[in-house]
Curated annotation (Swiss-Prot):
Main location class: secreted
Comment field (misc): Negative results: does not show activity at hNav1.8/SCN10A and hNav1.9/SCN11A when tested at 1 uM.
Protein name: Delta-myrmicitoxin-Mri1a
Subcellular location: Secreted
Asparagine amide: residues carrying this PTM: N103
Stated family: Belongs to the formicidae venom clade 1 family.
Originating organism: Manica rubida
First and last residue of the signal peptide: 1-23
Keywords: Amidation, Ion channel impairing toxin, Neurotoxin, Secreted, Signal, Toxin, Voltage-gated sodium channel impairing toxin
Amino acid sequence: MEVPKFLFIAVIVIALSSSLTWAHPMAAPDPNAEAAAGAWAEPAAEPAAEAVAEAAAEAAAEAAAEAVAEAVAEALAEAESEPGLPLLALLMTLPFIQHAITNG
């Protein structure tokens, strides 16, 4: 059974138009919304509290990276007899590597 060309084109047009509605500028949040809120906006956090939170987040990220590296090293050491396990260990670390690259 052959699909009519106009039906194929109609499906593509509908799919593209539905995806474009999500990218419409009116769907984006207003960057000036906080300035317009004025007194209703929350007070900014103190710089010292922000620095402490940032340092804690960096320490947690470093600890997680060290834990992943240690787990990968252990998995590779145990997997010498089974050739598929190093590949599995590598594939399981890809999300962590991507997170570390994209989030600094």
